[in-house]
Regions:
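Residue-level detector of Asp-centered blade-edge/turn motifs that repeat once per structural unit
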Residues: 2-5, 52-56, 95-98, 145-148, ...
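Gly/Pro-rich loop segments of beta-rich domains
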Residues: 25-48, 75-89, 118-141, 166-180, ...
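Structural signal for beta-propeller blades
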Residues: 16-19, 67-70, 109-111, 159-161, ...
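Loop/turn-rich, solvent-exposed surfaces of beta-rich toroidal or solenoidal domains
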Residues: 178-206
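Beta-propeller domains
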Residues: 9-33, 73
Length: 259
């Protein structure tokens, strides 16, 4: 995720930590975890997603290997996190404009919405077991919430992105491929890290097919290439940031307008 001051906050999954990296710097700074793999409150275990909660000046972290969601203050003297939810097979996180927290669960094949501090939550996508039906998901990972509280879900092993309108009982398919990270702009254009095809896809609303806007020539390590892209984020200047997973780097691409 990219903060307003052009600081990138990165989930460093294999090193069990969250790192912030100011654009242009040669080194990042560990801001959560970083004390080896573990389950203590100062440790993380294979984190998969993070978001910035500006109202409380904190990070909310999906601590996947520990089956918990943590809140971690961004104050410099913070040494450990606080458990918001535990015993949850979380993968992706999002927050809407009313500060509801959304979490995908890869074992229950659902997305739930929570008020901060609530433990039970409300199912807003899936929840009907693993399956291919429009009311089902199969290991949902990354999620995005738009201004109307529609839920966009990377429905990983169904190889699709599903859109669930607020209070809907089933979703609609808005992308097919190998989705991981995703972002939806105000015109409902969908941007997806199509990890299996090593490319970033843009899919305008109503389009019958998408366009590759980065990568797409097979895996590679050149600046124009990607190798299993996972995370995806935009900054306020419309630049696209991609966690280029198997190249162990974050790539930045200026976004070209839709012709």
């Amino acid at each position: 995720v990219v903060d307003d001051d052009q600081t990138i906050v990165i989930v460093d999954w294999g090193n069990h930590r969250i790192v912030k990296w100011k654009i242009g710097d040669t080194n990042g700074q560990v801001i959560a975890g970083g004390h080896d793999q573990g389950s203590q409150l100062n440790q993380l275990n294979c984190p998969t997603d993070v978001l910035i909660d500006k109202e409380t000046n904190s990070l909310i972290i999906c601590d996947r290997g520990n089956r918990r969601v943590l809140r971690w203050s961004r104050r410099d003297d913070t040494t450990e996190g606080e458990i918001l939810l535990d015993n949850i097979a979380c993968w992706g996180l999002a927050m809407d404009n009313q500060r509801y927290l959304y979490i995908s669960d890869v074992e229950k094949h659902e997305v739930r919405r929570y008020q901060i501090g609530e433990k039970k939550g409300t199912i807003v996508a899936g929840g009907q077991g693993r399956g291919v039906g429009f009311n089902q998901l199969n290991e949902p990972t990354y999620i995005f919430i738009d201004q109307q509280q529609s839920v966009y879900v990377s429905d990983t092993w169904n190889h699709r992105v599903m859109k669930w309108a607020k209070d809907a009982t089933e979703g609609t398919v808005v992308f097919r491929g190998f989705p991981r990270g995703l972002f939806v702009d105000t015109s409902e254009t969908i941007y997806v890290a199509d990890y299996g095809s090593h490319r970033l896809m843009r899919w305008p609303k109503g389009a019958t097919q998408g366009t590759a806007i980065a990568g797409g020539n097979g895996e590679g390590e050149e600046a124009s290439e990607l190798y299993y892209p996972w995370g995806l984020s935009f900054d306020q200047h419309g630049q696209l940031f991609v966690a280029d997973h198997s190249n162990h780097r974050v790539q930045r691409f200026p976004l070209q307008p839709i012709a």
